[in-house]
Amino acid sequence: MSKNETLFERAQRTIPGGVNSPVRAFRSVGGTPRFIERAQGAYFWDADGQRYIDYIGSWGPMILGHVHPEVLEAVQRVLGNGFSFGAPTESEVEIAEEICKLVPSIEQVRMVSSGTEATMSALRLARGFTNRTRIVKFEGCYHGHADSLLVKAGSGLLTFGNPTSAGVPADIAKHTTVLEYNNVAELEEAFKAFGNEIASVIVEPVAGNMNLVRATPEFLQALRRLCSEYGSVLIFDEVMCGFRVALGGAQEVYGITPDLTCLGKVIGGGMPAAAFGGRRDIMAHLAPLGGVYQAGTLSGNPIAVAAGLKTLQLIQAPGFYDTLAARTTRLAQGLANVAREARVPFAADSLGGMFGLYFTESIPTSFAEVTQSDVPRFNAFFHKMLDAGVYFAPSAYEAGFVSIVHDDAIIDATIDAARGAFASLAA
């Protein structure tokens, strides 16, 4: 057996499914998960020594590539000072100031350790602020694994064909209303029917957990208008797209100002870190100022903050996002071109440093369209590319990520590998 196979067999004895997050298990695509030993730049290496071009980037955080020397130096500089204090630090003030500077809708921000904590806390805050219970989310949007958000969600739930997780009590799920993404008419009907009950609407302005699906400007404009009209809190879940699609996130791209924003991934630079923030009058309801309780032992961890702060500083370099977007577009268009040459039904889209690959005739705009993907053909493509040393997301329903160190040569090598993969699919 290969070392990957041996490790997977061993892992399954002590870890449910052999992995600590379901999509890593390769259950959707089949085969043996790759156990990663090290990474550098745009590449990582598995336990058997195979090198891969990495297009998951730890599911988004590695926008600078792996082991960026300045991020590494920033982390090494603070390691000797202590790993965790359970008390305030100057560095957490600095990262809060940086986030508020880069995302104008965020007047105050609270650090947490995961995207799930960020969305869970933001929703509790919205309920406390409005004194209402009902929340609205959208089919296929994934906002972490808090009970009220695991209703018709995306990400691993979509990968494994379970629209709602087992273990979510009906009494909790009943407070969550699920609408179709990008459906303005349905949204308006919902607000007309029970708008005065809605505490919050939470949305991925660029969905990345039912593959990459962009919100239409009209949809987000309607969300902003209706939330303002009915006094509901509009939450942008930018855990994935924040600092990924633009320096100011999707809200900069669309020109829409949410009341609260959830961030993660990039703001930790590869370390466990996330945040939620927004209007000062809403954030004032958080303890110790207000009655909405939220806490975390490792929130604002100094090592994670060091990595995140340096990452946020580096992505402000002139031309950073223009270069990142150009390279991601080069990848998406190149893959679409070679698929067309092979006459394989396929579409690709990109925004900033995110991309989506769809085994469909056109780019989807909703959960229902995403689920029309030819999953068996995607799975075959995934393994052809994996064998060629290219690691895409092991699911037809996950977005991909490009880093600033994925240069044209790396992207062109990926496209060349895809040419052979698509040709074999057409045979």
Swiss-Prot record:
Reactions accelerated catalytically: (S)-4-amino-5-oxopentanoate = 5-aminolevulinate
Enzyme Commission number(s): 5.4.3.8
Cell compartment(s), UniProt: Cytoplasm
UniProt-listed Pfam families: Aminotran_3
Positions of post-translational N6-(pyridoxal phosphate)lysine modification: 265
Gene Ontology cellular component list: cytoplasm
Pathway per the UniProt entry: Porphyrin-containing compound metabolism; protoporphyrin-IX biosynthesis; 5-aminolevulinate from L-glutamyl-tRNA(Glu): step 2/2
A GO MF term: pyridoxal phosphate binding
Keywords, alphabetical: Cytoplasm, Isomerase, Porphyrin biosynthesis, Pyridoxal phosphate
Cofactor entry: pyridoxal 5'-phosphate
A GO BP annotation: protoporphyrinogen IX biosynthetic process
Main location: cytoplasm
Record-annotated disulphide pairs: none
Subunit structure: Homodimer.
Protein family per UniProt: Belongs to the class-III pyridoxal-phosphate-dependent aminotransferase family. HemL subfamily.
HAMAP family: HemL_aminotrans_3 (MF_00375)
PANTHER family the UniProt entry points to: GLUTAMATE-1-SEMIALDEHYDE 2,1-AMINOMUTASE (PTHR43713), GLUTAMATE-1-SEMIALDEHYDE 2,1-AMINOMUTASE 1, CHLOROPLASTIC-RELATED (PTHR43713:SF3)
Protein name as annotated: Glutamate-1-semialdehyde 2,1-aminomutase
Organism of this sequence: Paraburkholderia xenovorans (strain LB400)
Gene name for this UniProt entry: hemL
